[in-house]
Regions:
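ATP-binding N-lobe of GHMP and related small-molecule kinases
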Residues: 1-93, 112-121, 148, 166-167
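ATP-dependent small-molecule kinase catalytic core of the GHMP/sugar-kinase superfamily
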Residues: 2-4, 12-28, 116-225, 239-278
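Residue-level signal for inorganic ion chemistry
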Residues: 11, 39-41, 65, 99, ...
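A generic structural signal for alpha->beta connector loops
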Residues: 36, 48, 78-81, 159, ...
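Short, basic/glycine-rich phosphate-binding loops at helix/coil junctions
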Residues: 45-58, 106, 128, 193-201
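Short, active-site-adjacent cap segments at secondary-structure transitions
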Residues: 47, 91-92, 171, 235-237, ...
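A broadly conserved amphipathic alpha-helix scaffold signal in soluble, globular proteins
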Residues: 70, 105-111, 125-128
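Glycine/serine-rich anion-binding loops at beta->alpha junctions
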Residues: 85-114, 226-240
Length: 278
């Protein structure tokens, strides 16, 4: 069985402060896309955990898929292992949450297959130890996020079609958040103000100065709609009212770029799958 590991986009991203431990306080809105990696799990009688399809440039010990499986195994002691394979579509370092999504899908799938019976809340708490974005993928609903990204409130933004461009570069989140040019004192806004159109990606200006490929993609997509960057990049997106319109824009994409169209989803494809199983 294939388990979806969907992309997310940040509809806006503000930094409202910095905590004493160095983590940034943020406000953002997450929405899922119907565009996913795909994971398969083969349960083993031994406790061995193995990734059959290693990702280029990512060491197994730092891969969030392996780390998530080992984390759940250590927490619940299922006396079983797993062999995992992945078909990768989401770009690494693209701001679409690929690694966090992979971790969440691994936790949810193995909680089911190992019959470890953790609740969604318990899985989300476990996921938070792997990354701030993992809990939103565990819960599986579009969300307003505060704190370091772990304080989630369900929201229901519009679900348009998106054109997503994948520039040929990987953006370092650490580099962006450590930049002296990054604004860290945005005025907090409310959900209603966001839903009425307020909010922007405060990281975008820093990224555009350092990554010409992202700047080029933003400028090109702005010819067709309001282009925005997801997370700390590198991917940029714009929304359109119909699949036909989005497809027409994608067909004009320069040959040296990669891109795709996807539907915005307020329930993740993984959450939809799990609701059908229950």
């Amino acid at each position: 069985m294939a388990w979806p590991s969907p992309a997310k986009i940040n509809l806006f991203l503000h930094i409202t402060g910095r905590r004493g431990d160095g983590y940034h306080e943020i406000q953002t809105a997450f929405q899922f896309l119907d565009y996913s990696d795909s994971l398969e799990f083969q349960i083993q009688k031994s406790t061995t955990i193995e990734l059959l399809t290693p990702l280029e440039g990512v060491k197994n010990e730092s891969n969030l898929i392996i780390r998530a499986a080992k984390c759940l195994q250590a927490e619940t002691n299922p006396q079983q292992g797993v062999m995992i394979s992945i078909k990768k579509r989401l770009p690494i370092g693209g701001g679409l949450g690929g690694g966090s999504s992979n971790a969440a899908t691994t936790l949810i799938a193995l909680n089911h297959l190992w019959q470890t019976k953790l609740t969604t809340t318990e899985l989300a708490q476990l996921g938070l130890t792997l990354g701030a974005d993992v809990p939103v993928f565990i819960h599986g609903y579009a969300a307003w996020a505060e704190g370091v990204g772990e304080e989630l409130t369900p929201i229901l933004p519009a679900e348009p079609w998106y054109v997503v461009i994948v520039p040929n570069c990987q953006v370092s989140t650490t580099k962006v958040f450590s930049s002296q040019e990054l604004t860290r004192d945005c005025e907090p806004i409310t959900i209603s103000r966001f839903l009425s159109g307020e909010g922007k990606n405060i990281c975008e200006g820093v990224v555009l100065k350092s990554y010409p490929a992202v700047s080029e993609a933003v400028n090109w997509l702005n010819r067709y709609g309001q282009s925005r960057m997801s997370g700390t990049g590198a991917c940029v997106f714009a929304d359109f009212n119909s699949q036909i319109h989005a497809q027409q824009v994608l067909e004009n994409l320069p040959d040296h770029w990669r891109g795709f169209i996807a539907k915005g989803c307020n329930q993740s494809p993984l959450a939809t799958l799990m609701s059908l199983r229950n």
